[in-house]
Design a protein with these regions (language model features):
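Structured catalytic-domain cores with a bias toward divalent-metal coordination
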Residues: 2-417
Length: 417
């Protein structure tokens, strides 16, 4: 009898021990996205080719210079927007900054940096996405305003948006332009209720009204910017009728068209190139779907050059399912290049793939399919169980011309409106 009880206790201890081991393994897996932080290339070889960010150079032929961000919720990736843009202004004659942000909201920023009222923080909030309500974006906007205070005529910096996911500012500025150009806005007024489309007007009604306004504007001199507001509103209107999957593809197509429009505006003003920045998934020049970058890179006349980014480890500021609440979550990219940057002692560095020999270990790894981090504006506990949901599996040197690696990325702090 005693032996039976002893055996039962032993079995219970064994089962309990196995459950503890399984629970610990699950916690490790959920923390690191695997049973460790991934593989890495030779840190010494990486060290031989990696350079500081201030060494970034792009070909003279580059007309659209793009900077990606692996996440929307890290301070370093927002700081890089300013740091790299300054280099492009100084070394490449760039005068246009184009953001993955609402076109109308970014026009409000553009007016601010040209002497408009308000504060840099208020200007950043006008962009329309909470991810840009940060001190990092306010610092970028302040730099552009300060630069313009002493800029020569025609050499001022300009702030553009190439997204179309907001309505209010584009509609407001379109109405202002119509009033200045003596174009009737009676029917335009009927299209909106507050900051949204009127429920009484369907897609065909909106399209018909906006098309008529555009036709009238085309007969007026100096109406090009106003016409683009119409185009943005038509894009926004069409996107509202599509599912997420179809809408994402169309959004990238629209963003590519808008970037080309921005480039054309700058070239008419005597500037041959522009700087654009958005999520890696939009600026990458290759992928399974037609991203903005892929579409732009197909046309050699664009001279598309893209700098991707990645992290080794991130504390990322992300929204929960409740729009008002955000959370800071830790992720590891499992990118062997980012891990090599960490082991080589870098906090941040730049790697130009054109300088890395193709037959080297580093060159082969950069050209092979590998994991990289990619986090957007959403978080779910499922991401802990499915690491591919926050990683992409692509060849870095095919997606980008060069990359910046941030080894330990810190969260942004979203400012109150």
């Amino acid at each position: 009898m005693k032996n039976k009880k002893t055996r039962r206790f032993k079995i219970r201890y064994i089962v309990f021990g196995l459950l503890c081991v399984m629970a610990l393994a699950a916690l490790v897996f959920m923390r690191f996205g695997g049973f460790g932080t991934g593989e890495n290339v030779n840190p010494e070889e990486f060290l031989a080719y990696a350079e500081p960010v201030e060494n970034i150079t792009v070909p003279e032929s580059a007309k659209i210079i793009a900077l990606g961000e692996a996440t929307h919720g890290n301070a370093e990736f927002q700081q890089l927007k300013l740091e790299v843009f300054k280099l492009m202004v100084k070394n490449n004659g760039v005068r246009a900054f184009a953001l993955e942000g609402d076109y109308g909201g970014c026009e409000q920023v553009n007016r601010y940096i040209h002497g408009g009222e308000g504060t840099a923080q208020e200007a950043a909030a006008a962009i329309g996405f909470s991810i840009y309500r940060t001190e990092e974006m306010a610092e970028l906007i302040s730099y552009m305003r300060q630069y313009n205070e002493s800029a020569l005529e025609g050499e001022d910096l300009r702030f553009y948006g190439f997204d179309m996911q907001r309505l209010s500012y584009s509609m407001r500025f379109l109405k202002e332009s119509c009033k200045e150009l003596e174009v009737d806005t009676t029917n335009l007024q009927k299209l909106v209720e507050g900051e949204n489309w009127s429920s009484e007007c369907d897609l065909s009604t909106r399209t018909e009204t906006l098309t008529q306004v555009k036709k009238e504007l085309e007969s007026k001199n100096g109406s090009e910017n106003a016409i683009h507001f119409v185009d943005i509103l038509m894009q926004h209107s069409e996107l509202q009728t599509l599912t997420n999957a179809d809408g994402a593809t169309l959004r990238d197509q629209f963003m590519a068209e808008n970037v080309q429009w921005i480039l054309q505006q700058e070239q008419r003003n005597g500037h041959e190139n522009i700087f654009v920045t958005g999520h890696n998934s939009h600026v990458a020049k290759w992928g399974s779907s037609d991203s903005m970058g892929k579409l732009l890179s197909k046309d050699a006349a664009n001279g598309y050059y893209v700098i991707g980014t990645d992290f080794y480890k991130t504390h990322c500021n992300m929204p929960t399912r409740s729009p008002e609440k955000r959370t800071i979550q830790v992720f590891y990219s499992h990118d062997p290049l980012a891990k090599a940057a960490k082991l080589a002692g870098f906090d941040i560095c730049w790697l130009d793939f054109t300088k890395v020999p193709e037959n080297s270990e580093l060159g082969r790894q950069a050209s092979e399919y590998t994991y990289m981090g990619t986090l957007g504006e959403s978080y779910s506990i499922i991401m802990r169980l499915l690491p591919p949901s926050y990683r992409m599996f692509q060849p870095p040197a095919v997606l980008y011309d060069s990359m910046i690696f941030v080894t330990d990325a810190n969260p942004t702090k979203i400012l109150e409106e």
